[in-house]
């Protein structure tokens, strides 16, 4: 559903959607290096090399959305009004928007910290815009949960967490 909502918003064809070159994985499918605490998801960029006769052939970015189940479930337990489906939908929409913005060169993956914070606000605003325009059961508490991000930016403890390295891992994938 997240893919459909985001691709409809950005008016992406099925072919364009495939060209985003990404995958979404949950905790069961993540390696140790892909698991983080205090974040609901992270995007890791891998360099995907096509198998060709030329060893120095082209490399294409592959984005892996690493869903952090443990952090999501902790938030669901802590905040009674958060619904798992609506919360997960928000998270995946948010991460897909990041990938689209990376692919359209609207944001650099390796941007400096202050730019990443500004980008988080922009992406939260866009996520709210997309999810506000559809009827989804229990989405309002989720939008309220993230409301601070759409107004003044992240709260200080989130800034500190982001400064410690969120969304900046690069790995090579053969």
Regions found by a protein language model. Give the residues of each.
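Conserved binding/catalytic microenvironments
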Residues: 71-76, 118, 139-143
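A short mid-domain helix/strand-loop element embedded in enzyme catalytic domains
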Residues: 66-69, 95-104
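Short, charged low-complexity intrinsically disordered segments located at boundaries
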Residues: 29-39, 126-129, 153-163
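Solvent-exposed amphipathic alpha-helical surface segments
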Residues: 5, 9, 130-137
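Post-HEXXH active-site segment of zinc metalloproteases
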Residues: 73-74, 82, 86-90, 101-129
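A metal-dependent hydrolase signature that marks the N-terminal structural subdomain at the beginning
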Residues: 1-58
């Amino acid at each position: 559903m997240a893919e459909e909502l985001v691709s409809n918003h950005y008016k992406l064809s099925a072919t364009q959607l495939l060209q985003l070159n990404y995958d979404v994985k949950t905790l069961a499918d993540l390696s140790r290096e892909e698991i983080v605490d205090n974040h609901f998801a992270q995007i890791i960029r891998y360099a995907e090399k096509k198998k060709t006769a030329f060893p120095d052939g082209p490399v294409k970015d592959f984005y892996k959305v690493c869903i952090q189940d443990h952090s999501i479930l902790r938030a669901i337990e802590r905040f009674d009004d958060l619904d798992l489906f609506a919360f997960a939908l928000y998270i995946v929409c948010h991460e897909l928007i990041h990938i689209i913005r990376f692919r359209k060169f609207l944001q650099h993956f390796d941007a400096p910290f202050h730019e990443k914070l500004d980008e988080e606000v922009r992406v939260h605003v866009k996520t709210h815009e997309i999810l506000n325009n559809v009827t989804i059961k229990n989405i309002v508490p989720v939008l309220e949960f993230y409301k601070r991000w759409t107004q003044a930016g992240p709260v200080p403890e989130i800034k500190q967490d982001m400064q410690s390295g969120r969304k900046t891992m690069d790995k090579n994938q053969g």
